[in-house]
């Protein structure tokens, strides 16, 4: 039986296969990746060889043509290993779908096979030093010059920024557009493009193995053939795809909560104080029961939400709810679980310490939780 009611036998087998792969290729190396502050490209290649990169891509472009249920399995199993594997989810479920949905035939043939094989690692560059949630006010510009665009600007906090070979860059192609969001376009910038440089690898509180960087564009010459979709339609494309991004973040937070509860249950059953397991104390029991209840509610909410998403329903309000509530819940659970671990929970050798520092950023990226509440309020007519 699968984890979700929509899982069939093939999804269960796929999960087992992926878990076995990760137990061999990721778990033994994860601590070293955290120290190196980078996941090697060789791991991406292995993912591609096994069919775990963008399996939803159509077979004619090298993919397996699988449905979103497989993406759920991959996302969950990556998070189960550690949150620093979030870059795989960004590649599979966030960036590559833009090429699939809005790219033309030539672009699909040029880029998708590499995205599936691991020869390409993708990133999406929205955030700037002066523009995060306020996406319409980005300052990176792209000016048409014959068969090219000349791009100038800076991006920051870019997931997969160091390893990336393809970066989907959000640019202003019409700075005078009113309202401002009507002047935004999407350009695919390839590694090695003149005028494109990668900045420093940012030193984050958590997600140490996940490469996050600044990107610079100085008179960067990007072929007009790299425009994704239509000029000045970029904001619309982003709004259409951000729902899946937020769903992916919510799923990862749910898995993190499940993982933290599981490790804490194991700990309180074996750790003794005053001659008996600390799990026998009423305070510990109440805390763990409360966590288990929230996690069960989160699972049911996600299950329904994933089904609605696959059915093509409008999930904007509900996915915003899931994103803010599940990430906030995971943050709270991380603190409770660390407390139940006592002093050992503050030691790096215990996984709860890593979870404690990795989870907070989930409430910030993919649209801050405050923005999620604003979206919900507007759709409630407030």
For the regions a protein language model found, what residue spans apply to each?
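Alpha-helical interface subdomain recognition
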Residues: 1-81, 85, 102-107, 114-119, ...
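Long, acidic (Asp/Glu-rich), low-complexity accessory segments flanking structured domains
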Residues: 215-237
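Short Ser/Thr-interspersed hydrophobic loop/turn segments at strand-loop and sheet-helix junctions
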Residues: 51, 74-79, 170-172, 188-194, ...
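A short, Trp-centered hydrophobic/proline-enriched beta-strand micro-motif
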Residues: 118-126, 168-170
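Short glycine/proline-enriched turns and hinge-like loops at secondary-structure junctions
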Residues: 66, 134-136, 160-165, 179-183, ...
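A short core secondary-structure module
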Residues: 148, 152-198
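Flexible, small-/acidic-enriched active-site or ligand-binding loops
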Residues: 137, 192-223
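Short Gly/Pro-enriched turn/cap motifs at secondary-structure boundaries
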Residues: 88, 115, 130-133, 157-160, ...
């Amino acid at each position: 039986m699968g984890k979700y009611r929509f899982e069939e036998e093939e999804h269960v087998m796929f999960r087992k296969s992926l878990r076995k792969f990760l137990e061999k290729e990721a778990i033994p190396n994860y601590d070293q990746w955290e120290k190196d502050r980078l996941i090697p490209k060789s791991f991406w290649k292995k993912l591609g060889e096994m069919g775990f990169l963008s399996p939803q891509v159509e077979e004619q472009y090298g993919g397996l043509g699988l449905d979103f249920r497989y993406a759920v399995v991959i996302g969950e199993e990556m998070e189960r290993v550690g949150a620093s594997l979030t870059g795989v989810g960004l590649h599979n479920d966030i960036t590559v779908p833009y090429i699939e949905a809005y790219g033309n035939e030539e672009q699909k043939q040029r880029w998708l096979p590499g995205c599936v094989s691991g020869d390409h690692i993708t990133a999406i560059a929205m955030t700037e030093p002066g523009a995060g949630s306020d996406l319409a006010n980005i300052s990176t510009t792209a000016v048409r010059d014959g068969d090219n665009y000349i791009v100038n600007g800076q991006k920051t906090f870019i997931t997969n920024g160091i390893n990336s070979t393809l970066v989907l860059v959000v640019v202003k192609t019409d700075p005078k557009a009113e309202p401002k969001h009507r002047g935004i376009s999407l350009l695919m910038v390839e590694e090695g493009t003149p005028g494109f440089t990668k900045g420093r690898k940012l030193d984050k509180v958590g997600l140490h193995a996940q490469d996050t960087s600044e990107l610079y564009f100085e008179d960067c010459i990007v072929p007009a053939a790299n425009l994704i979709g239509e000029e000045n339609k970029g904001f619309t494309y982003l709004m259409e795809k951000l729902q899946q991004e937020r769903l992916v973040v919510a799923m990862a937070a749910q898995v993190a909560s499940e993982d933290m509860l599981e490790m804490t249950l194991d700990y309180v059953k074996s750790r003794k104080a005053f001659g008996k397991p600390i799990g026998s104390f009423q305070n510990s029991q109440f805390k763990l029961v409360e966590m288990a209840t929230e996690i069960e509610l989160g699972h049911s909410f996600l299950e329904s939400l994933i089904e609605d998403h696959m059915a093509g329903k409008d999930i904007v309000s509900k996915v915003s709810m899931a994103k803010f509530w599940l990430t906030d819940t995971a943050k709270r659970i991380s603190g409770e679980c660390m407390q139940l671990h006592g002093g050992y929970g503050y030691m790096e050798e215990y996984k709860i310490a890593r979870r404690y520092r990795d989870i907070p950023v989930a409430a910030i990226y993919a649209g801050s939780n405050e923005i999620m509440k604003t979206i919900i309020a507007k759709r409630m007519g407030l």
